Amino acid sequence: ADGSKDPIYLDRFNKKLKKDKTEIVYAERYGVGAGSLDDTLVTHIGNRIFTIIGKIFFDLKLNDILHTFFLCEVKKFKQINFEFKDFSFCVEFPIKAKRNNLSCSYIPTIEKKRYDGVPKVRSFVDGVKILTGMIILFFKR
């Protein structure tokens, strides 16, 4: 963990999960009351592109497909058969959650500046892996 996910949101996740009676609550860095102190221009643009692809091809309602900060019921999470062990998991989880008819809601969050060194993501290389993962998932309906 790089410290960019603020644990202050855990209580909000839990309250939202119970209030909305959903199975997943996603944190979002884009929209009213949200933001990121860790995004670069390249990662921001890439995330916007992948989010749009997710909305168009997978009918996702997320505004932040690559922000893998969420709360999900453990039994529901374990029902999903995950394939990817790289950054493609960021898109695999919401796509497969939707395909498994898991209900979801969202909370705005502020992503903190990481305190543990440099980002592990290699924007172009990992972006290609994520796009490849989305293509595989699209054809594996």
Briefly describe each language-model feature range:
Residues 7-87, 113-135:
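Acceptor/aglycone-binding surface of glycosyltransferases and processive sugar-polymer synthases
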Residues 9, 89-96:
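Short active-site alpha-helical segment characteristic of glycosyltransferases
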Residues 1-4:
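The conserved acidic donor/metal-binding loop of glycosyltransferases
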Residues 60-61, 82-85, 94-112:
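Catalytic donor-sugar/metal-binding loop of nucleotide-sugar-dependent glycosyltransferases
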Residues 67, 90, 101:
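Functionally engaged cysteine thiol sites
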